[in-house]
Amino acid sequence: MAPRPLLLLLLLLGGSAARPAPPRARRHSDGTFTSELSRLREGARLQRLLQGLVGKRSEQDAENSMAWTRLSAGLLCPSGSNMPILQAWMPLDGTWSPWLPPGPMVSEPAGAAAEGTLRPR
């Protein structure tokens, strides 16, 4: 009688060890996790890229602001030697922009701009 339970035990244990486990079916939660992870990784990569660009931009902004300050100081207070430089900035057709109203521009002398204005008595 002892061989019968032993045989039954061997059949149960041997049968389960002989068959490989069926492959696990892909679940919706696996895809959700994978897509969420990919999205988070992409967001982190873009954030690092933007931080790198902003860091570079802030360094460039400091350099550019200094250059514009120097340039604007020369444009706002032109000396006689800078006048050809100012005229070089004027477009060839004499119009600055189609959106700006016609009138005196930077390259025109101040006397022409002052003509026709009323002076207080």
Curated annotation (Swiss-Prot):
The modification Valine amide is found at V54. GO terms for cellular component: extracellular region; extracellular space. InterPro entries: Glucagon_GIP_secretin_VIP, Prosecretin. Belongs to the glucagon family. It comes from Homo sapiens. The modification Phosphoserine is found at S58. This is Secretin. Residues 1-18 form the signal peptide. The keyword Ribonucleoprotein does not apply. GO terms for molecular function: digestive hormone activity; G protein-coupled receptor binding; hormone activity; signaling receptor binding.
